[in-house]
Amino acid sequence: MVDDGTRKALSGIPLLKTKAGPRDKELWVQRLKEEYQALIKYVQNNKASDMDWFRLESNKEGTKWFGKCWYMYNLHKYEFDVEFDIPITYPTTSPEIALPELDGKTAKMYRGGKICLTDHFKPLWARNVPKFGIAHAMALGLAPWLAVEVPDLIEKGVISYQEKGSS
């Protein structure tokens, strides 16, 4: 079910060990360290294979994440804001990744621009608690969603390329 490129990307992301969410104070700090280490490794691997496609940062508590993601299509870079909150029941519950500016532009999205991950990603996440983290959500959730939805939205004329600096 997972293509070779995704399998290769996934194999380069460290698995997490600490089963802790935002309510777990000291354990959450340890989990956040693991999350950052996995994200850093994933970004390094992406850059090394010329597949760099997102930047993320979080608030001090590690409960709100935000940044940019982009998708290259026909030699044009389409860039989107990305955001999500860490659920209180994390890591049992996966984060709901949102691309607010695409809200309402595709059927594979919930209110607020949250991308639909129920059919393929959520069962996989559930089988891999607590080993999967934010980097895995990006690799197995957002990346495939962008690969399917962005070209479709472009072909339908729902989104169009904008030069940097133009509005």
Curated annotation (Swiss-Prot):
InterPro entries linked: UBQ-conjugating_enzyme/RWD, Ufc1
A Pfam family matched in the record: UFC1
GO molecular function annotation: UFM1 conjugating enzyme activity; UFM1 transferase activity
Active-site annotation: 116 (glycyl thioester intermediate)
Domain of life of the organism encoding this protein: Eukaryota
GO biological process, one term: response to endoplasmic reticulum stress
Annotated keywords: Ubl conjugation pathway
Family (UniProt): Belongs to the ubiquitin-conjugating enzyme family. UFC1 subfamily.
Function: E2-like enzyme which forms an intermediate with UFM1 via a thioester linkage.
Protein name: Ubiquitin-fold modifier-conjugating enzyme 1
Organism whose genome encodes this protein: Anopheles gambiae (African malaria mosquito)
